Amino acid sequence: MATTKSFLILIVMILATTSSTFASLEEMVTVLSIDGGGVKGIIPGTILEFLEGQLQKMDNNADARLADYFDVIGGTSTGGLLTAMITTPNENNRPFAAANEIVPFYFEHGPHIFNSSTGQFFGPKYDGKYLMQVLQEKLGETRVHQALTEVAISSFDIKTNKPVIFTKSNLAKSPELDAKMYDICYSTAAAPTYFPPHYFATNTINGDKYEFNLVDGAVATVADPALLSVSVATRRAQEDPAFASIRSLNYKKMLLLSLGTGTTSEFDKTHTAEETAKWGALQWMLVIQQMTEAASSYMTDYYLSTVFQDLHSQNNYLRVQENALTGTTTKADDASEANMELLAQVGENLLKKPVSKDNPETYEEALKRFAKLLSDRKKLRANKASY
C-alpha cells in the first residue's frame, strides 16, 4: 500500500513538473537577431536555411517559415535586408522569401550591387542604384505594419543625429515610422563610404511631412543588433500580453538566437603599438571601423552571455559566429563568385564547429535543440488557441 502511494506521488510530481515545463515553454518570447556585413550575409543566410529546414522536418510542413516561430526578428545593414526578406508578406500573406532563397539572392544580385562603382575618390564607392532597384522589385509597396511578425531594423538619421528604429510596436505613437520596406532596407544598408545616404519622407499623425536622412544601421547599433532586438521585445512586454513573461527583464523566459556575419583577427596580427604610434587620421580611418565593430560585437555577446548565465539560462542564448575569417572573406563588398562560394562554405563549415571552447556542442546540434524548442512552443500555443 505504501509502495502504491509512493508511486502515485511520484507520478503526480512528474506530471506537475512536465506541466510546468510546457507552461514555461509556452510563455517563452523568441528573438532572432542578424548582424550586418554586406555580402557576408551569406553566412547567416546559410544558418537560417539550416534552421528553417529543421523546423519544416519537425513540423512536417514544407511551408513553415521562420516568421512563424519568432516573436521579434531584428537586423542591421545586410541583416536588415534578411529581416525584410523573411518577414515581408507576398500576395498570399506568407514571407516572400524562404530561407533557402537567401544565399541565391546574394549570388544573383550581389555582383550588380557591388559593381556599380562611382569611381569617385571623394564620393561613395557604389551608387546604390541597383540596390534600390532590386529592393523595390522584391518588396514592392509593403510597409512596416504589414510585416508578419515584430521587426527591429535600425538606421541613423544624419540630420537629427539620432538612431531611427523601425518596429511595428512604435507605429501607434509614431506613425511616421510606417515607411516602405524598400526605403528602410536601403537606409539600413547605406554604409558610409559604400553607398549614398538615403532621403525619403512620410507623414506624421497630423498629416505633416516627416523627413528622413538615413545611413547604415551599424552607425546606430554597431553591426550586432542583438541588444536592440531584445530591447524591442522587452518594450513590447509593457503593452502586449504575449510578451508579459519577460517583464522586468526576465531573460529566463526568452530564447535569443544571434547570427553573426563573421569576424577576423587578421588586423591584430599586422599592426603593432610601435607602428600605429606614427599613424595619422587617414591610416586610422582605414581600420578603425573594423576594430570598433569587432570590439562592439564582442562586448554585446559578452554582456548577453553573462546575463543569461547569471540567470542559469545559458541554453536560452545562442550566438552563431565565425571568428577566423581570412583573405577575401573578410571583405563586405567582394561579390565575386569565388568569394561568395567561400562564404557559403564558411557557413556550412560553421555548423560543424563547437559553440565554444567550454561547450563541445556543435552549432548544428545547438540549432537543432533551438528548433525543437521553437517547434514545441508553436504547437503549445496553437493547442491553447484551439480551445
Curated annotation (Swiss-Prot):
Give the GO cellular component terms, alphabetically. Answer: vacuole
Q: Which Pfam families match?
A: Patatin
Question: Which ranges belong to the motif DGA/G?
Answer: 216-218
Q: Locate the motif GXGXXG.
A: 36-41
Instruction: Kindly state the tissue distribution recorded for this protein.
Output: Tuber and stolon.
| Segments forming domain PNPLA | 32-230
**Active site, per annotation:** 77 (nucleophile), 216 (proton acceptor)
User: Where does the record place it?
Assistant: Vacuole
Q: Where is this chain primarily localised?
A: other
Molecular function terms from GO: monoacylglycerol lipase activity; nutrient reservoir activity; phospholipase activity
Residues forming coiled coils: 361-385
Look up the signal peptide feature and give its range. Answer: 1-23
What further note is attached to this protein's record? Patatin have a dual role as a somatic storage protein and as an enzyme involved in host resistance.
| Entry text on domains | The nitrogen atoms of the two glycine residues in the GGXR motif define the oxyanion hole, and stabilize the oxyanion that forms during the nucleophilic attack by the catalytic serine during substrate cleavage.
| Keywords from the UniProt entry | Coiled coil, Glycoprotein, Hydrolase, Lipid degradation, Lipid metabolism, Plant defense, Signal, Storage protein, Vacuole
Family, similarity comment: Belongs to the patatin family.
The enzyme's E.C. designation: 3.1.1.-
Q: Does the keyword Signal apply?
A: yes
Enzyme class, top EC level, equals: hydrolase
Identification of the protein by name: Patatin group A-3
Q: Which GO biological process annotations does it have?
A: defense response; lipid catabolic process
Give the function comment from the record.
Probable lipolytic acyl hydrolase (LAH), an activity which is thought to be involved in the response of tubers to pathogens.
Q: InterPro entries from the xrefs? A: Acyl_Trfase/lysoPLipase, PNPLA_dom
